[in-house]
A protein has these predicted regions:
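Generic structural marker for isolated residues within well-ordered, non-membrane alpha-helices
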Residues: 68, 169, 228
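GST-like fold's C-terminal all-alpha helical module
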Residues: 104-225
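Alpha-helical scaffold segments in carbohydrate-active enzymes
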Residues: 29, 93, 97, 171, ...
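GST-like domain detector, emphasizing the conserved glutathione-binding G-site
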Residues: 1-134
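C-terminal helix/juxtamembrane-tail motif
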Residues: 229-239
Length: 239
């Protein structure tokens, strides 16, 4: 059986990483049996030092895009069989845009935004023993801030970053329109890729009921909210 390695459930979504969610949902859509192992400890054995990765009877595959490609070929997945070459090209480019743009807005909203950081800190580091819990979060937060700045998103003001995220959300809302899924009535791997990012904004729940400005903005797009609910009703009834 395939083992999927991820970070684990946080904020009411099945994983804090959209890339883990993408692989998880893809396998659910494709009816591929798997088991999940979760925790940052698995970063030590990750082939590329990141999560997710899968172990398929001893074969390790890392990176969500590579994993989906491998599973599609290895298990003859036909989710995208009815898509045209043009639709597949559109899906690829939009997915890349989300991975390189909206993702970093998500990271900013959790790790840099002061109103969100205390809740993210508690979720990610709350189980650390007291000595480590006092300094590890701030060390990692500084590293994440440096990465966001190097990537480029972190060089912008909070309002500019929110506007960047909103542009992606607005574009997705326009593309989805009144359809059930992005390419019609049948879900595809592209829906898994889009949901993996959207759920991290729209489906998140904090115990205190807090919502940051990014989540509030995402929820203004009712068709995207309904899309996430549609996916969850079909594939995540255990939520």
């Amino acid at each position: 059986m395939i083992t999927l390695y991820g970070f684990g459930k946080h904020f009411n979504v099945m994983d804090a990483s959209p890339f883990v969610v993408k692989v998880d949902l893809f396998m659910r859509m494709a009816n591929i049996p798997y088991q999940a192992k979760q925790g940052t400890k698995y970063l030590r054995i990750a082939p590329k030092g990141k999560l997710p990765f899968i172990d398929d009877s001893g074969k390790l595959v890392a990176d969500s895009e590579a994993i989906v490609s491998y599973l599609t070929k290895q298990y003859q997945v036909t989710l995208d069989a009815k898509l045209t070459l043009e639709q597949k090209a559109q899906a690829y480019l939009i997915t890349k845009s989300l991975d390189e743009g909206l993702y970093w807005c998500l990271v900013y909203s959790r790790w840099v935004l002061d109103e969100s950081w205390p809740l993210a800190q508690k979720a990610f580091f709350g189980k650390l023993p007291a000595p480590l819990r006092w300094f590890i979060p701030s060390v990692i937060r500084r590293k994440v801030k440096k990465n966001i700045h190097s990537q480029g998103v972190g060089r912008h003001s909070p309002d500019e970053i929110l506007a960047m995220a909103d542009k992606s959300l607005q574009s997705l809302s326009t593309l989805l329109a009144d359809k059930d899924f992005f390419f019609g009535e049948q879900h595809t791997s592209f829906d898994a890729a889009v949901y993996s990012h959207l759920c991290e904004f729209i489906s998140v729940r904090f115990d205190c009921g807090f919502e940051n400005v990014f989540t509030k903005q995402a929820k203004t797009y009712q068709n995207l909210v309904q899309f996430c609910q549609r996916i969850e009703d079909q594939f995540y009834q255990e939520k």
